[in-house]
Structures are given as C-alpha cells and as structure tokens.
Amino acid sequence: MSEALKRMAAEYRANAGLLLKRINELKSELAQTDCKTSDWTRLRGRIMILEILYADSISTARYLENYHGGN
C-alpha cells in the first residue's frame, strides 16, 4: 500500500473516532431527554446521521487499507 493511501486511511479512522465520540456524547444526552419531546427527536435524528457517517468512514478506511491496485 502506498504511503498516501496509508495516510488517507489513518485520517478516515481518526475522523471515525471523532464521530464515535460525538455519537456517544449525544446518546448520553438522549438518555437524559424525555422521549416525548422534540429535543429527543432532534437528538435521535442527529445520532442516526452521525452513525451513517461513522459507518462510511470506517468502510472507506478499510477499503483504503486493503486496496492493492487493479490491473
């Protein structure tokens, strides 16, 4: 794997770590929020979007880590 791909994969993993940290912060806040409020709905929506971004970041990092080039 080229150094550029290694760096890119590391950046995606680092960003995924930041996303996961924020997801966990929001989940903690969600647990303390009444589920019958618009705040709960808003938080749940933000968490769902961040979870998608997290999954995409991990997927991209794995792809870059395992890319061998095609012929």
For each feature predicted by the language model, list its residue ranges.
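Short, charge/polar-rich alpha-helical segments
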Residues: 1-21, 44
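Amphipathic alpha-helical coiled-coil segments
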Residues: 16-19, 23, 46-70
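Charged, low-complexity interaction regions
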Residues: 30-41
